[in-house]
Amino acid sequence: MCTGKCARFVGLSLIPLSLVCIVANALLLVPNGQTTWTKDHLSLQVWLMAGFVGGGLMVLCPGISAVRAGGKGCCGAGCCGNRCRMLRSVFCSAIGLLGAIYCLSVSGTGLRIGPQCLMNGSWDYHFQDTAGSYLLNRTQWNLCVEPPDVVLWNVTLFSLLVAASCLEILLCGVQLVNASIGVLCGDCRKKQGSSQ
């Protein structure tokens, strides 16, 4: 597969993954679909907006850049061919890689610590000292009185963010290597309308 086609494939994969991260982070802001607890009782990991900023916007830009690097257009002609777009894609992929790593680390921490919830009359991170063992003991999930089903909500959405950011790390890494090869060697696709 040539560098242009690979870039296009990676970009078309990164764009929906970044949108999934943005939506998952938006849903984390409204536990159980309600805004009642949004002001004072969301965990720090939700407020860090790792899905929106890291896995979302910081990966959306390299996704779009990779699609453009894999396309044919006015920048693909001339003395440098498609190398200018590939160079831009190298830098964007590095930024996307950092964003996906940020999303993975914050989401993983959110899974390990658990949500802030009302249990035994106090709002706290009641699962913080379990080192993530609460994830396997679903009977503990019902101990959180408010917000209702917050543990299931957080586990589902943070797990989705972890999975999406792992894929984003892989794809941004592939595009980083692919675009570097594209800068050094050029695109292997034959030019349309050449006289050879």
From Swiss-Prot:
It is a multi-pass membrane protein. L-arginine binds at residues 123-128. It is found in: Lysosome membrane; Cell membrane. Disulfide bonds: none annotated. Glycans are attached at residues 120, 137, 154. GO terms for cellular component: lysosomal membrane; membrane; plasma membrane. Pfam families: L6_membrane. Residues 1-9, 67-89, 178-196 are cytoplasmic. One of its GO terms (molecular function) is arginine binding. Residues 31-45, 111-156 are extracellular. Residues 90-196 are annotated as: Interaction with MTOR and CASTOR1. InterPro entries: L6_membrane (IPR008661). The chain crosses the membrane at residues 10-30, 46-66, 90-110, 157-177. Keywords: Cell membrane, Glycoprotein, Lysosome, Membrane, Transmembrane, Transmembrane helix. It comes from the Eukaryota. GO terms for biological process: regulation of G1/S transition of mitotic cell cycle. Interacts with MTOR; the interaction is positively regulated by arginine and is negatively regulated by leucine. Interacts with SLC38A9. Interacts with SLC7A1; the interaction is negatively regulated by arginine. Interacts with CASTOR1; the interaction is positively regulated by leucine and is negatively regulated by arginine. Belongs to the L6 tetraspanin family. Acts as a lysosomal membrane arginine sensor. Forms a complex with MTOR and SLC38A9 on lysosomal membranes in an arginine-regulated manner, leading to arginine efflux which enables the activation of mTORC1 which subsequently leads to RPS6KB1 and EIF4EBP1 phosphorylations. Facilitates cell cycle G1/S phase progression and the translocation of the CDK4-CCND1 complex into the nucleus. CDKN1B and RHOA/ROCK signaling activity are involved in TM4SF5-mediated acceleration of G1/S phase progression. This is Transmembrane 4 L6 family member 5. It comes from Bos taurus (Bovine).
